[in-house]
Curated annotation (Swiss-Prot):
The modification S-nitrosocysteine is found at C663. Residues 22-315 form the Dynamin-type G domain. The keyword Nucleus does not apply. Residues 586-600 have a biased composition (Gly residues). It is a peripheral membrane protein. This is Dynamin-1-like protein. The gene is Dnm1l. Residues 357-502 are annotated as: Middle domain. Expressed in all tissues tested (at protein level). Longer isoforms are preferentially expressed in brain. Belongs to the TRAFAC class dynamin-like GTPase superfamily. Dynamin/Fzo/YdjA family. Residues 550-567 have a biased composition (Low complexity). Pfam families: Dynamin_M, Dynamin_N, GED. The modification N6-acetyllysine is found at K616.
Amino acid sequence: MEALIPVINKLQDVFNTVGADIIQLPQIVVVGTQSSGKSSVLESLVGRDLLPRGTGVVTRRPLILQLVHVSPEDKRKTTGEENDPATWKNSRHLSKGVEAEEWGKFLHTKNKLYTDFDEIRQEIENETERISGNNKGVSPEPIHLKVFSPNVVNLTLVDLPGMTKVPVGDQPKDIELQIRELILRFISNPNSIILAVTAANTDMATSEALKISREVDPDGRRTLAVITKLDLMDAGTDAMDVLMGRVIPVKLGIIGVVNRSQLDINNKKSVTDSIRDEYAFLQKKYPSLANRNGTKYLARTLNRLLMHHIRDCLPELKTRINVLAAQYQSLLNSYGEPVDDKSATLLQLITKFATEYCNTIEGTAKYIETSELCGGARICYIFHETFGRTLESVDPLGGLNTIDILTAIRNATGPRPALFVPEVSFELLVKRQIKRLEEPSLRCVELVHEEMQRIIQHCSNYSTQELLRFPKLHDAIVEVVTCLLRKRLPVTNEMVHNLVAIELAYINTKHPDFADACGLMNNNIEEQRRNRLARELPSAVSRDKSSKVPSALAPASQEPSPAASAEADGKLIQDNRRETKNVASAGGGIGDGGRIGDGGQEPTTGNWRGMLKTSKAEELLAEEKSKPIPIMPASPQKGHAVNLLDVPVPVARKLSAREQRDCEVIERLIKSYFLIVRKNIQDSVPKAVMHFLVNHVKDTLQSELVGQLYKSSLLDDLLTESEDMAQRRKEAADMLKALQGASQIIAEIRETHLW
């Protein structure tokens, strides 16, 4: 085992550097029948006489032997308080006051130390008899023993009671089954190597050790066969076929050893002398196999198996070291080198921050957020999604009802009854609706301002980690950018307010889109009027026989012919146009845009005035369709005295045809013009925000930072590192160096040959 000691020591340094758990080497579990030489094999591997020996049943309790490597300078370094079995199993605490090079300690004796291995052997016998009795009884309760030595590796060996068939002494009748279950409990651990011990003077085909090993390890990946007592075979026979695997092949190999006899033990023959005599015996009896058998070769084979296990763990350890090295290298880079030229460093950091801030807005930053929108992408989302959807959700006629429209029309006419809808009422109502676009526009400015504030934090956290070295510089940069954004906010709000005020200042009824909408609306209303007259005029005329109907409208039958309806429509329209022309020439109507010229041409804009004049027949039809709504009474009710100081009480009455049509016209005009203004606002507000806020900050950010921070009087204060920065830089450099050394150690272990 000595060959593994330097490897394990190197790995220990690696684990201490990386902070990983120590590789747990496999347990070596020895199984076999009674008196097959199991304990002798373990003693030869450890190199110490510490196990009870004798004839018959000697090992009657499992012995878990933990070998703990200690360097000579670590002896008597600490004191361990290890009373809990779980804690004791994983503990590597030493004890002070030990003068010997090697010592042992039992779990059941707590902190008592044993420097004489004869005392250890005697304590094992005493503890066995205390639990199992002194008459061949067997107990599954293990004995825990730790041996501390500079000549061992951190390894666990398990010595189990030998398999038996017939109970003796105090053994129960099912002793065979109990021992079998005990053995299976230990060898079922996948992280164990099974030493299947078989005596050479028995037939290997009847080996109970190999049989039970194959139950848990059918592929033979962790089973090593050991043939003991080669010197006790019958005269004229040898174990050549068995050792060469011709009888029963074993994947990991079959190794023969020669144990000390009871006479040798009684004569105090040392393990070293026994190994020397064993080598001489093998050279004499098995010269061709001498170099592949014996206790030394068994130890080398176990070393090889343990090294394979270690190497299987190295790739994961190597990956962890590489990841940590990359992290510490990045951390060291973020700490930067000590500042020599403060002026150049300050200018470099300011320039880098300004560049990263602008790049984040443009979408070309080095560190791009993947979990959410940020920077310019979020500003775009605010413009075209948040702001756009908010404007589209504003109802053009929201907050308006028929009473509001009629009241506005009446208030605009003053004391005189109006022949046409005054343009003042349209402007009053449409301005009221346009004013509702100002609040979402200002909210758009606020959202963009908040996002530009968030970009500051984004650049500080991801893009310019060097600023973390200088907390005062970081705070100063944040303050300058925040002040710049704060100064631009009222300017941008004022511009957005002006955009809405511009729309309110002049209602352009000659806007091309508005003129097209009015023309299309006139055609639709005119067509609806003709269709309604042609469909319902005959029934209306028959119910009013006392009134005088123009001869052109008198029906020839209950359902007039299409020609008669068309003729009646034509005359009504001509009458309306004549009346409209006469009134227009007298100066009535809404503005100059609706005036018909001397040549009798139709107006291009404001043509909707003509539809406000209706014929008597159409009023007769419309009165039947109008619905009652609460409206201020024009005259007092009969039977009630009138007091002009009383508040008028709304009563329900039907809208006249003209009132109904006036409301419909105003609503359509408001909606048409509101959509035009909303389109303008939706286009102009983002442009104003970009010009007065976003682009202005981008263009002036670096000059603002340089002007306020790049001053000789501020250099020392701004570039003062945090108190622990130098210490953290040193720790990161030391850790990086240690990780590089650990990586080199792993490379050396991969190239280590133990045989």
